[in-house]
Amino acid sequence: MFLRPWSRNFLCSCRGFSVCTPYASIKSASELALKNISELQALQKIQNHTEKLKFFSSKLHNKGEPFTLQLGDLITEHTSVPELNEILDKFSQSNELFTMRFLEKASIIAHKNRSAELARRLRTYAANAMIDLSRVAFVNIFWTLLKTRDKEGIVETIEGQPIAFKVARRIFRRLLVYTSEAGENIEICFFLTNSLFKRLLNNREALSKDEKSELQNLYYDLLLCFSYSYYVPGVKLLLPMLYNGSFKEINRTAIDRSLLALLSTGELEAALELLVYLKNNNIPINDAYLRMMVINFCLANKPTLAVRFCQAWFKQSKMLSSTENLLLIAESLSRASNDFAAISKQMQPFSIESSSFYLPSHRLLMLVALMMKNSSGILHSYAVLKKANAITNKELRIMMQHAMDLRSTEFAEAVLKESEFTLQSNRSQLLMDFVAILFLNKEYTKAFATLEKTFASKIKPSHNIISFSLSLVKRFGTKNDLFFLRRSFKNMGIETLDEIEKNLPPKVVYRCFNY
């Protein structure tokens, strides 16, 4: 090509131009370019918007001369939204005038003025003229709608619009930053994930290796965004993509936060599905999440489901069969029913010898029996555990607590005898429990003797037992009882006795086992 394209419309006027073009055609094209420059300069000299429209219309409807102007020539950086709307109203029937250049310039005005109505009109005119929005026009329209929180407009703009991966990535990146900073637009983020991200995922085979990696990173960033916002619909929308194998690598932070969001909002079914996925893929699960699952079942008054969950998962974590965890379920069971026999029947599938949850279920029943002060239930479960050589210090302290509830020194002595072969540290706790029961039953002489005997065995009384005994003797004992108690403690070297007695509350509670 040997002519210099000095006009922005030169190439448009020379469509089909080739080296074989006749000289007359070349001359005609150059004349059109000169005419376009002349008319454009004339249009730019007009300051009044109405006069500009008149000039443009006169050139448009002049059939005797070729029309060289473009609708975008009417737009300057000073064009207002009402003026642009007037242009659209006047030329709305002429789809051929809506070029990409016009849409780009108009979208800048819409974005600058945050006019969602104008942005939606531009999108509609582009669709009517069958024009795919350029990156500039699309981004301007999209951010205008986003900043004005026009959810429907955003979704309509996305649907049917071919969007390159780089543009989509930029949209999500900026949206994620905007959402995290402002704490808003989480629903718009959800709508875009449901439409645009799904579209990217369905077309991932066409992406390069780096783009696939970026898509995976984007997935986990979206998951984190929804999780930190506790926006459950978003979490539940994204997780199935992980389950069906769309992404091979695991982002533990995103998964943990998702699990926390589901558990915190009581979405037990979705949380359980995620736990099963982690278990099947040999991914370690934090004990805290399993405990939260149990807590949720108990709060929902579904203790049987909590037991079933523990049975299925206790091999994953010893915490599920621990006394602390079983105590939660026991409290839920005792709230649901006052009939221990009915609860025992309910727990029968778990407490039979062939059950994998056999021993933990009897620990559970023992706790329920303790709460209901059912001696036969406690003794039966204790016998089962003893037969299996599964007695721990927790069970002995439960028995001691039951002795305290019954105010039975004989029961406490029997429990103490059972503990003869336990560790010294565990036995010292039980001895203190026994002393507390003696004081509770006003058997002060025996209590003093036991205290001195335990001290001779290098077992020092705890702060709790000192406070408890002082409180009881002060309230129910004689002056002599109080004198002997103080002397016993001083003989044991309790230097802070006066301070403890001075700060003694009106009533001190002692428990062998807290429930």
UniProtKB/Swiss-Prot annotation:
<dbReference type="GO" id="GO:0070124">
    <property type="term" value="P:mitochondrial translational initiation"/>
</dbReference>
<protein>
    <recommendedName>
        <fullName>Uncharacterized protein C106.19</fullName>
    </recommendedName>
</protein>
<dbReference type="GO" id="GO:0005739">
    <property type="term" value="C:mitochondrion"/>
</dbReference>
<dbReference type="GO" id="GO:0008494">
    <property type="term" value="F:translation activator activity"/>
</dbReference>
<dbReference type="GO" id="GO:0070134">
    <property type="term" value="P:positive regulation of mitochondrial translational initiation"/>
</dbReference>
<dbReference type="GO" id="GO:0005759">
    <property type="term" value="C:mitochondrial matrix"/>
</dbReference>
<dbReference type="GO" id="GO:0140517">
    <property type="term" value="F:protein-RNA adaptor activity"/>
</dbReference>
<dbReference type="GO" id="GO:0030674">
    <property type="term" value="F:protein-macromolecule adaptor activity"/>
</dbReference>
